Amino acid sequence: MRNQTLSAIEPRLMDWLKTLLHSILHLDEALPQWAAAYGPWIYGILFLIVFCETGLVVTPFLPGDSLLFAAGAVAATASDSLNVHLVVGLLIVAAILGDGVNYHIGAYLGDRVRNGNRFIKKEYLDRTHAFYEKYGAKTIIIARFVPIVRTFAPFVAGVGRMSYGKFLCYNVVGAIVWVVSLAYLGYALGNVPFVKKNFEIVILAIIILSILPAVFEIARGWLASRATVAEPKGES
């Protein structure tokens, strides 16, 4: 019975993932369609996506960097659909509130999730801890530009009981820098012919550039662990 249920769910899940991926890669098409379908509620949709991506550790897969860039680009090409300044203001608030909620969830759960659980992967927590070891409290700002780590940084700050006043300062600065830089970059480049013609490639490039720091950290950690394991063999 369980296998039959899983068999029925898997095709729907795959279809949903394909739809999500298509929407992320074609946000230049999706956002105007959402604006036409939902009117001013498009701002609420964008707010909710950014809030969930930053505020809930179970939704790190939602678009962040690419969404901000795309929203700015669409505002440049279709100002009747989106107002870039309103988008920037709302999404700064969404990012601040999201990180704040995430911090308090981490503080509430505390030691119960230090080693991960069925919903929170330990490798994500370890990766975020590594960022804190390297950058300290500035991780709250730097992590804004690193997918997955961005979602887990405020959570780990809460688990580690970082001073909320200190966290809030970094949270506000990070949210402003993140949203303003990416949304206005999209707005500045939105009417550039190359960007308009190759929007999917541009979004892919943003995603790849976003995850490169995490990839380098993982590779460095893997090489360091291999070197540690190999040392005793070399000595013998």
Positions of predicted regions on the chain:
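Membrane-interfacial helix-loop-helix
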Residues: 9-47, 73-166, 191-206, 213-236
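Short, amphipathic, aromatic/basic-enriched membrane-interface segments that mark the entry/exit
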Residues: 35-36, 56-60, 140, 168-173
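Transmembrane alpha-helix interface/packing and boundary motifs in multi-pass membrane proteins
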Residues: 47-69, 210
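MFS transmembrane alpha-helix packing/gate-lining sites
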Residues: 94, 177-178
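Transmembrane alpha-helical segments of integral membrane proteins
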Residues: 179-191
